[in-house]
Amino acid sequence: IFIKRLFKKKLMAKDLLKDKKFLWVTGGSGRRPLMTELAKKLESTHNIDSYYLSFSTFTEGLFDSFGISQDKMVYINYDAVLKEKDRKPDLDFSQKKEIEYGFKIFDIWNIYSCRYKERTKIPYDNILIRMEHLIKEIEVMVENIKPDYAFVVGISAFEGVVIYKMLTSLGIEVIELKHPRIPKRLTFNNNMDSSSWPLLIKEYDKLKQRDLNPEERKIAEEFIDTFGGKRFKSGSDIKRKVTLKSKFQKYKEFATVVLHRKRLPPSLKPWLWYPIKDRLLKYSSRFEQPQNGEKYVYFPLHIQPEASTSIFGKWFMDQPSLIESIAKSVPSNYKIYVKEHVLNYSTRPSGFHKRIKQLPNVRLISPFVNSTKLSKHASLILTITGTAGWESILMQKPVITFGDVFYNVFDEIKKVRDITKLTAAIQEKLDTNIDKEKTLKFITAMYASTFPGIATLPSDCQNVSISDENLNNIVEAMQNYLQRIKS
């Protein structure tokens, strides 16, 4: 009630969604049902015209099952062009488009190639042919549809980055739905170059110029008290029940995708070998436990491959190398606690853990140790783009980041762009505390720039995010966001 009363404004501005053309940039992991249901809601409330972009022709049947007409679909597929004999890439075209749209092809390709070893073997010419085809198809699509907005839920593939770069260069607004790491709140981002949310920057800049009023202070302090050392996960809005029914549904969805693709995924390891390896490593001596009374800085490992590192932390993707730099920069009376991620510990490449464990002042901590307690007792938290940084802010702990993440806009965060400056940054932040008053202002800015609702993928929240109530929340939030960001 307090939040709604404090931040909800009656905006009498023009309806920025009515009669607009939307391009829905679809993808896997539950994005399709969220986007199709949200599109239907906007069609009924704001009379939008929806088009759907897919990068796989196998999804044709899937979209049919959602009631989407094929004349509303745009498919971009590389198979035909790659089968053309004697085809060579147009190098002049590629260079011209890199300049025109502001990206480097092999920078973006890394997002794709790092996911499977087989992709690293794709020839140079084939990569350029794929990119050339993708760029041309997007240009044709934009010319034919002329969308007003493009909507994405997390960019995780190289096509998503190309789409974003091209559409923004062509004057088309790209809206990304975001989970702001505040339970039952959502926001949007239309500046994915830096991962700094424009509305958050706007609200935080205003708050820095004044004192908090009593109600704002109360809300921010209650949020810190409610946090109380609990972790905020992207799917934490609704507890995910793992039942026989949910397991069956998961495997049914997998089987449906395989059926439409008419081929197995590139690797069956996630389904067959990794669950066995999980159990073996859980009880192995590879990982250590924290030691009482030991001073340490904390670095939680990221899941890889993932957009958090391949896109937003691309200069620091080699985590063992980054940990080695941290180990060289920390005073000799401190250890570095490197905690493995509970969802990634059995899927690391060969030699990954060995590189970390051979550093004498580093402990490789078990993935099952409580992350929040590690942050709470650390002298410093270092992360590329992790949620651990946001959680540490709430505990007024010092944080150093290396990548692009929303909380970098907070004045108390130290972002290291030049690794040669890391030693000085650690010395500056080690064993300090974040000013609580500044923390309360940043939390207030977070609330002021977010909206009631759930941005979690349906499969992670028992489909609550596609309930009628939540879809209405997203639509209202989108309208308010666009009005406020343009005012």
Residue ranges of predicted features:
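Conserved N-terminal ligand/cofactor-binding loop architecture of enzyme catalytic domains
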Residues: 3-7, 40-138, 179-278
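Nucleotide-activated donor-dependent transferases that construct or modify glycoconjugates
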Residues: 15-29, 151, 301-304
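Short loop/turn segments at strand-loop or loop-helix junctions that form parts
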Residues: 55, 114, 179, 297-306, ...
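Conserved nucleotide-sugar donor-interacting segment of glycosyltransferase catalytic cores
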Residues: 136-198
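Catalytic donor nucleotide-activated moiety binding site of glycosyltransferases and closely related
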Residues: 324-366
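A donor-sugar binding/catalytic signature common to diverse glycosyltransferases
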Residues: 152-153, 367-414
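Leloir-type glycosyltransferase catalytic cores
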Residues: 198-247, 414-487
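Active-site donor-nucleotide binding/catalytic segment of nucleotide-sugar enzymes
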Residues: 291-327, 340-343, 447-454, 458
